[in-house]
């Protein structure tokens, strides 16, 4: 900043010298040569200073109040455009400064000044054009096509697109002139300046766009817009979009690559970017016309500035009002049923608990049949009497057996060797079928007849239907408790999250990226952090006990807490991990302070967020999300919808006995990434359940994007610049 101010002071000193040299008695040739030398010297000083800033920012004299960093947020860009144009207009108001510019090709010099803002316009445009489902305009078109409440929105959006295109078409030429400022001729620039203010003027387009944001009622007496203090921007296009998003069905909302909050903010950004483009072209054109001797345009310039300032403030207030009432949480739709692939789109715990058929005679050490099936609520398999079903299917000899019950005495069991299953289906003598009956005699299955029997007259040796909890090579039941941390010391933050299974262990994997100012992220730095592998015991050493850096699920401890963790204002998410709390898996999130204007993360002051409530908590205890007779999650033909709230928990359980012979563990775990596009700071992370009645559903991550409404304030200091009226007065 010091070097920039120093350079500008030297430039001003040069200009004062210029006024001395421009005496009437001097030769015009001598004056022109001297002016060229002085201006070139000053320009070299300024260019050197700008180059030292690595083109990340440019600043005008501190007295003008114009400071530009990487202006990726629309409000900052608008303020900067207003300050830059005011400063340049004030300088040009000096007659001899104007004469100097005229002598040196002043139109191109003014064009170069405006070109200094090109990268900042381009940066915001690039962000608005990013996303896997197209840029902001394409996403807004999707709302028109897919939302069930889009009639009003479609009409307004179509009108806005036409107006935006009018401004963009002209700005494309303006941008082309800036890129070729050294060769563009005076006639071309003069035609451009006159075009901006003729016919369907930019001024009218900007006014129409703003009226769509802030509709108002004309005063019947003088047909003037009401006083600025009385304007309340209700019922505008931002509110219309909010209504369309609120009423849209879940399958549409989850298809977006950003939160509803982010989408409305991006519409606001698009409209304010368009306003800034138009205002810059209007001011540029008046400056040129003034140079070309077409008039002073002081009144027009000042009126345009006042209108632009009013529109800027009103748009920001309208956006802030809408954004404060919109959710900034984002979740993803199910992968289409036909595209589901295990360990790519979803993950499941395998054989955590599994339906298991066993005869009572094998459930006690004495091989007796004196009890009923229900007596064996927590037992073990003691043997394999008579080499019957137990000899023809995988046993549960090293595990625990729970919740036995009697169904019928005799059945046909389709035993299978498919991964993750013991049985395909069971058909009882009565004709009752559990599971989906298919051809059984094949390379992967065989039909085994089971008949209960009487031992003497008094005891019935019944086949029981139980649950088997048996660790082993077929049972993936492990969850990493290691922290997944972004490199916050290198100014990285979490930008996305997903579940990954590696070496039979479920991990949290984070996407990280470099934080940039004002909520943005350097897309070139995005990467998924490598998984730190965990080795779990195998063979005889494998148990259902927790180990170093991991938790093992088992019948007694198989619950997952469902929470939304929100960082304090001024913090972003920089890490995630699971912990064990009261036998439950419980999510923790690391939040680190961040400076909004600079994007600088203070990694030394990071904190861990968690929800310590348990089902036994006296106030606000956790409640259970129950799954009633659930089928396999991927069999649902209807997309899942969220059905849990924070402060709940869910237990991993077997699928329905009737639908699936209790062979799978549900809910499944969603493996698809949850990351906004374009990337933005994340201020919250949650785990929730989504599903449909009668199915296991999925546990999945959701994320909260930055609430921009917290930062949409315009202070009086930001309007602290000198106008032309001040200069002339």
Protein language model regions, located:
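A positional/structural detector of protein chain ends, strongest at the extreme C-terminus
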Residues: 1-5, 726-729
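Cleavable N-terminal signal peptides of Sec/SRP-targeted secreted and luminal proteins
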Residues: 3, 8-27
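Lectin-type carbohydrate-recognition ectodomains
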Residues: 24-729
């Amino acid at each position: 900043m010091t070097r920039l101010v120093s350079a500008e002071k030297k430039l001003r000193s040069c200009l004062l010298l210029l006024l001395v040299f421009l005496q009437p008695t001097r030769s015009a040739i001598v004056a022109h040569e001297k002016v060229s030398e002085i201006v070139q010297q000053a320009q070299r000083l300024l260019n050197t200073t700008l180059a030292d800033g690595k083109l990340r920012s440019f600043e005008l004299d501190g007295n003008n109040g114009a400071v530009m960093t990487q202006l990726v947020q629309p409000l900052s860009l608008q303020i900067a455009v207003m300050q830059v144009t005011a400063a340049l207009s004030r300088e040009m108001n000096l007659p001899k400064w104007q004469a100097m510019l005229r002598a040196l090709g002043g139109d191109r010099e003014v064009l170069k000044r405006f070109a200094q803002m090109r990268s900042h316009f381009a940066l915001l445009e690039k962000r608005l054009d990013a996303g896997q489902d197209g840029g902001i305009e394409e996403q807004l078109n999707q709302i028109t096509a897919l939302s069930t409440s889009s009639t009003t929105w479609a009409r307004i959006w179509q009108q806005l697109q036409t107006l935006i295109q009018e401004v963009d078409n002209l700005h494309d030429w303006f941008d082309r002139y800036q890129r070729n400022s050294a060769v563009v001729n005076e006639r071309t620039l003069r035609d451009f300046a006159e075009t901006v203010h003729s016919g369907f003027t930019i001024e009218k387009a900007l006014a129409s766009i703003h009226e769509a944001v802030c509709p108002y009622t004309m005063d019947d007496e003088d047909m003037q817009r009401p006083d600025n203090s009385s304007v309340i921007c209700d019922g505008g296009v931002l509110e219309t979009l909010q209504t369309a998003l609120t009423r849209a069905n879940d399958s549409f909302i989850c298809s977006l690559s950003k939160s509803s909050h982010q989408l409305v903010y991006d519409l606001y950004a698009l409209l304010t970017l368009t306003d800034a483009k138009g205002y810059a072209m209007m001011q540029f054109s008046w400056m040129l016309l003034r140079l070309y001797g077409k008039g002073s345009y002081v009144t027009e310039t000042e009126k345009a500035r006042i209108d632009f300032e009013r529109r800027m403030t009103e748009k920001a207030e309208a956006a802030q009002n809408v954004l404060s009432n919109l959710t900034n949480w984002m979740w993803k739709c199910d992968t289409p049923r036909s595209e589901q692939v295990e360990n790519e789109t979803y993950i499941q715990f395998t054989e955590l608990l599994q339906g298991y058929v066993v005869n009572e005679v094998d459930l006690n050490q004495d091989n007796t049949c004196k009890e009923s099936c229900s007596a064996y609520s927590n037992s073990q398999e003691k043997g394999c009497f008579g080499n019957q079903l137990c000899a023809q299917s995988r046993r549960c000899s090293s595990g625990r057996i729970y919740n036995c019950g009697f169904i019928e005495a005799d059945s046909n069991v389709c035993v299978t060797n498919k991964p993750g299953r013991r049985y395909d289906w069971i058909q009882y003598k009565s004709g009752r079928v559990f599971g989906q009956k298919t051809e059984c005699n094949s390379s992967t299955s065989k039909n085994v007849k089971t008949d209960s029997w009487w031992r003497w007259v008094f005891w019935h040796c019944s086949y029981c239907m139980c649950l088997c909890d048996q660790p082993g090579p077929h049972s993936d039941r492990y969850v990493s408790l290691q922290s997944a941390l972004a490199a916050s010391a290198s100014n990285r933050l979490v930008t996305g999250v997903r579940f990954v299974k590696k070496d039979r262990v479920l991990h949290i994997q984070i996407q990280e990226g470099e934080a940039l100012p004002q909520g943005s992220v350097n897309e070139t730095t995005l990467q998924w952090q490598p998984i730190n592998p965990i080795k779990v015991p195998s063979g005889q050493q494998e148990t259902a006990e927790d180990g170093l850096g991991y938790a093992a699920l088992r019948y007694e401890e198989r619950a997952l807490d469902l929470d939304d963790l929100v960082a304090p204002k001024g913090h972003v998410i920089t890490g995630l991990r699971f912990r064990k709390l009261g036998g439950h898996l419980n999510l923790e999130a690391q939040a680190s302070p961040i400076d909004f204007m600079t994007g600088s993360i203070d990694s030394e002051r990071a904190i861990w967020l968690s929800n310590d409530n348990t089902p036994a908590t006296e106030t606000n205890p956790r409640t259970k999300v129950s799954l009633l007779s659930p089928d396999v999650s991927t069999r649902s033909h209807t997309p899942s919808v969220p059905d849990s709230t924070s402060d709940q928990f869910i237990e991993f359980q077997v699928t329905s006995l009737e639908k699936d012979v209790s062979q799978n563990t549900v809910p499944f775990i969603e493996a698809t990434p949850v990351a906004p596009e374009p990337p933005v700071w994340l201020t919250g992370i949650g785990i929730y359940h989504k599903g449909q009645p009668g199915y296991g559903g999925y546990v999945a991550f959701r994320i909260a994007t930055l609430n921009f409404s917290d930062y949409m304030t315009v202070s009086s200091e930001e309007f602290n610049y000198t106008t032309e009226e001040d200069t002339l007065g």
